[in-house]
Structure formats: C-alpha cells, structure tokens
Regions:
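Conserved nucleotide-cofactor-binding alpha/beta core module
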Residues: 133-134
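Generic N-terminal leader/presequence segments
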Residues: 1-3, 234-235
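Conserved glycine-bearing catalytic or ligand-binding loops at nucleotide- and phosphate-handling centers
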Residues: 146
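Active-site pocket-lining/capping segments in soluble small-molecule metabolic enzymes
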Residues: 10-16, 20-130, 149-152, 157-284
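N-terminal low-complexity segments that are often proline-rich with Ser/Thr-Pro
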Residues: 2-12
C-alpha cells in the first residue's frame, strides 16, 4: 500500500492510499485514510494490478462520497498517438461519475481535459517530476489545484516549495516504490526484461534481490566481474566485513549487479546517483 501526505493551504494534513480492490479501499478508509485513488482503465500505469473497470469505479466513487471521503482517478500513462484517438470518449463516462480530481502527468492529456472538461480538478502526478517551486508555480498557472512532488526531494526542498507557492496544495510520498530514474519514469523494468513501466507493465525490478560484483573494463571496453563484494539484500543487516567491503568501492568505478547466474548488468555510481549504460536506455 502507498500513502501520501496532502499539505493543503489550510495546513490540514490528510492521508491518501492507493488500492486495487474494494477490500483494499474499505480497509484504507477503516484505518483512517481520508482519500483513495485508482487508475482509469487503459490510461493508468497500474493497469496490470487494477481490478476497477468503469462499473467498479462508479461504485467506488459512490462509496467514498457516502463516507465523506474523496476518490481520485489516475490518468497518468505516457500516451502514444494511438492512445489519444479515443481518450476523450473513454474519459467522458469517468468524469460523469464525479471523481474529486484526476491525477495526470502528460501535458497533452492535461490540455485535452482542460479543453473538454474545464470544471474538472487536476492534480499533477509524480510522473511529471516536479522538483522545484518554479515548476509548481507553472502548473498552478495552468489551472492545476495540486502537485504531487517527486520522491527525490528533501524536507527542506519541500518546505521551500511550499513557501514560494503557498496557495498550491502539495502532496508527497511517505511510503512506496523506489523508481529507477526520476520518480515514475522508470527505465529499469524495460531494461531488465522488456516490460515498459511507462506503459503500465512495471515489474518492480527496483525491489529484486541483487548481488554486487566488483568489475573492471577489459581491452575492448566491456565491463567484466573481478570479485564479489556483497551477497546480502538491501533489507538485511550486513555484518562488519560486508560493510567494510562495500566501503572500499569508489565512486566512478564500475560494478556488476547480478540477479541470477545468467543476468549481470553493468552500473556506475557517483554522488548524484546510479547509472545503467546500455542502448536499451534509448527505448524510452
């Protein structure tokens, strides 16, 4: 389950939760969630997990409103031209259900909603990667009522954004996935196994169990393993020897990440992050 803090202009904090079924939604409300959200069929990055068709969306929205809660519909896919053809037709019955807002990331889809449904409230999705107050101010000028900030921000940065755009609602993740690249625009799933996270098929490769191998470049420039540095997962306690070995790795030196005997992936790390260098990266 994911959770968010919604820091509104009234300084009231509310809790939001992602869900995939009526049971999830009812548990979320029973345990104090103020709002929930679910993806629109065909236009959400949660299409593999989403049990909500249009009929279920309508029931979910009605149940939420009957409890005095809010229900947001996520429309955050990165659309190709083919997805634009029927977008307004498919969205019209969803708008008629009166969700409290649409969560969106693509400027083109946002423009289309603004043109056809100017009364609908739009929240900027984390997929749009808002990381500074100028970006937040821009989206406010476009008529959006809330911005979901990228996970990469510190508390000080979030506070600075709120100070510079005090009348914009701010939403932040307090629990959830760790994306490769900026929040939501993940290349790792497609890189690892050709399942595109930006089209709703994320395999959560960021949560797999990896081994780390020291590596070096050979005469042809290929990265080859030297020795294994670490065997534990990110979520296990490491003993002193393992910690020492990891500390010996220097920024800028290549490593190999291994999931199983057949798969090894070259990576480099510096003070700014971790990099996977491969021609597959261009597919995004």
């Amino acid at each position: 389950m994911y959770a968010f803090l919604d820091m509104t202009i009234s300084h009231v904090t509310s809790l939001l939760s992602l869900f995939f079924s009526f049971m999830n939604m009812r548990y979320a409300f029973a345990y104090g969630a103020d709002a929930v959200y679910a993806g629109q069929p065909r236009y959400s990055l949660r299409v593999r997990n989403n049990a909500f068709d249009h009929d279920n969306l309508k029931i979910g929205i009605s149940e939420a409103h009957a409890l005095g809660k809010k229900f947001y519909v996520v429309v955050n896919i990165q659309p190709h031209n083919s997805k634009l053809k029927n977008f307004i037709r498919d969205l019209t019955p969803v708008v008629a259900m009166q969700p409290d807002a649409l969560i969106m990331s693509d400027p083109g889809l946002i423009m289309m909603v603004r043109e056809h449904f100017p009364e609908v409230s739009i929240h900027l999705s984390v997929q749009a990667n808002a990381v500074n107050w100028a970006t937040v101010k821009f989206w406010k000028s476009m008529g959006l009522t809330r911005v979901i900030l990228s996970r990469e921000l510190s508390m000080d940065e979030i506070e600075e954004i709120k100070q510079n755009v005090p009348d914009m609602e701010i939403e932040v993740f307090v629990h959830g996935a760790l994306c490769m690249a900026y929040s939501g625009r993940c290349l790792l799933s497609g890189y690892m196994n050709k399942r595109d996270a930006n089209q709703g098929a994320c395999t959560n490769a960021c949560r797999w169990d990896y081994k780390i191998h020291e590596a070096a470049e050979d005469d042809t420039g290929d990265v080859i393993p030297v020795t294994q540095l670490e065997k534990s997962t990110c979520c296990q306690n490491k003993d002193a020897d393992e910690q020492h070995a990891i500390q010996q790795h220097q920024f800028g030196e290549p490593v190999l990440l291994q999931r199983n005997e057949e798969e090894q992936f070259a990576a480099e790390e510096d003070e700014h992050g971790t990099y996977f260098m491969n021609s597959k990266d261009l597919r995004a």
